[in-house]
């Protein structure tokens, strides 16, 4: 069964909502930064000196870093270069999908309004013969997480809420 064990993170793809794209534009070797945290604001209650309440203030999303071997011809690289070289920023959305053994999405992260923040190329060294790796750092507004179980739970919660209202 696909859900009997934690999923391996080596089979994934990234799809940008950009045109043009090339076959290599979905291929990355590493993705980091799909992190969200809640910022809290302390609030002191009058007459209560033992503690302060921590009220949720806003969500903070970390930068997304995409790494891959350097390819010739990339619509993603063209988009990023226009931003960092010409200061032409065009926000775009992207979908990151973790795939199963049949190449079907198991988990999805939809990243909204991403723009390039930095573009870096790994060191080039004639003595090592390593693959040249490009790193693209994106800043974005937020991401949404989708998987079959959470979609089913959201749908069930919506159905039960409507049943409770109709009773």
Roles of regions detected by a PLM:
Residues 1-167:
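Glycine-rich, low-complexity intrinsically disordered segments
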């Amino acid at each position: 069964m696909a859900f009997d064990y934690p999923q391996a993170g080596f089979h994934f793809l990234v799809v940008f909502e950009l045109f043009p794209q090339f076959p290599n534009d979905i291929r990355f070797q590493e993705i980091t930064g799909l992190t969200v945290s809640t910022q809290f604001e302390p609030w002191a209650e009058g007459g209560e000196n033992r503690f302060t309440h921590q009220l949720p203030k806003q969500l903070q999303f970390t930068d997304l870093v995409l790494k891959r071997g350097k390819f010739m011809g990339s619509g993603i690289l063209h988009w990023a270069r226009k931003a960092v070289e010409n200061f032409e920023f065009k926000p775009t959305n992207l979908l990151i999908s973790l795939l199963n053994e049949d190449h079907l999405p198991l988990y999805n992260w939809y990243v909204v309004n991403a723009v390039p923040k930095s573009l870096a190329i790994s060191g080039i060294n004639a003595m090592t013969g390593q693959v040249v790796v490009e790193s693209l750092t994106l800043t974005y507004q937020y991401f949404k997480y989708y998987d079959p179980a959470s979609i089913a739970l959201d749908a069930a919660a919506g159905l039960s809420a409507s049943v409770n209202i109709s009773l």
